[in-house]
Amino acid sequence: MTEKDADSGSDLVDAFLSDAYLNTEELRKDGPFSPDEFLVSKRFLGLDGLVNELSRLFEQVNNELMLLVKDNYQDFVHLGSRMKSGNTKVSTLISSIHRSEEQLKNSKQSLIGHSTEIQNNLKHKQDVENEKLIASNLLLLDQILKFLKSNDSSHPLWLESLNNAQRLCDTYKDHPWVQSISPTLINYIKH
């Protein structure tokens, strides 16, 4: 290696470490910052040099940020107060949402209670309807028995009435009144 080559290599190292090579203006170019492009442009710089350059750039950006805050302090304070006001509004909204959720839970519980009550009432109504049907059929059976008692077997509707009475007795055979009149019906069948 000649002295000229050594000087040339030394100049190259000096160029890499100089502010001319580590130009921060490239960070200010239009468009988004590309870490890949930055690292490719610094590929000949050693790791320590890259760390030093990044530390220096960080300090520079930090100082510029502080200068911006200092120059625009009133705007910065106003931004902080707007953020605080926004946080207050968000807190108010959150508490309103929590109250609404609680009201919805209470409404849901109330709705479930009303739904259960309605189902019970519908079941009771159905039971009452069934009882009315039983009572109506038992009244019909009583009328049929009175008809059978007051008419003899030669009447044209007598046999049909007897069959209807038997059908009703079979349907309600477990009812106490039907059990009590079964002997009477058996007597009519024997005639």
UniProtKB/Swiss-Prot annotation:
Recorded GO CC terms: cytosol; Golgi membrane; Golgi transport complex; nucleus
Subcellular location: Golgi apparatus membrane; Nucleus
Keyword Protein transport in record: yes
Biological-process GO terms, alphabetical: endoplasmic reticulum to Golgi vesicle-mediated transport; Golgi organization; intracellular protein transport; retrograde transport, vesicle recycling within Golgi
Coiled coil: none
Pfam families named in the record: COG2_N (PF06148)
Keywords, sorted A to Z: Golgi apparatus, Membrane, Nucleus, Protein transport, Transport
UniProt KW Transport keyword: yes
Membrane topology type: Peripheral membrane protein
Chief place where the protein resides: Golgi
UniProt family annotation: Belongs to the COG2 family.
Complexes and interactors: Component of the conserved oligomeric Golgi complex which is composed of eight different subunits and is required for normal Golgi morphology and localization.
Name of this chain's protein: Conserved oligomeric Golgi complex subunit 2
The species this protein was found in: Schizosaccharomyces pombe (strain 972 / ATCC 24843) (Fission yeast)
